[in-house]
């Protein structure tokens, strides 16, 4: 598994960005092959982070490009700065997702 963390700073309206990411962008990510998970975090103080997991690095790179395009086309006034991206092979997982 390959995981990508995108950290956006200077977000103007985090609540709106999170809502739109879940409603509009998440379905696009979910439709990509090899997709096991997508999380959006409102970290406060104008910081929003997303965590995306894929079965392969290629799928993650494709998702990164799709994310950049979606932000530029849909919320450029709310997310004025490019994200700091951290990505790599997932070396350990423990998850318990409530229903």
Stretches with model-predicted labels:
Residues 1-49, 55-69, 76-99:
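Short S/T/G/P-rich N-terminal loop/turn motif that feeds into the first structured element of a domain
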């Amino acid at each position: 598994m390959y995981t990508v963390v995108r950290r956006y700073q200077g977000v103007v309206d985090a609540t709106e960005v999170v809502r739109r990411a879940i409603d509009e962008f998440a379905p696009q990510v979910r439709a990509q092959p090899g997709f096991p998970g997508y999380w959006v975090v409102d970290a406060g103080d104008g910081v929003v982070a997303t965590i995306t997991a894929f079965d392969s690095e290629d799928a993650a790179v494709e998702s990164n490009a799709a994310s950049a395009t979606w932000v530029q086309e849909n919320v450029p006034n709310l997310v004025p700065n490019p994200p700091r991206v951290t990505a790599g092979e997932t070396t350990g997982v423990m998850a318990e997702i409530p229903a």
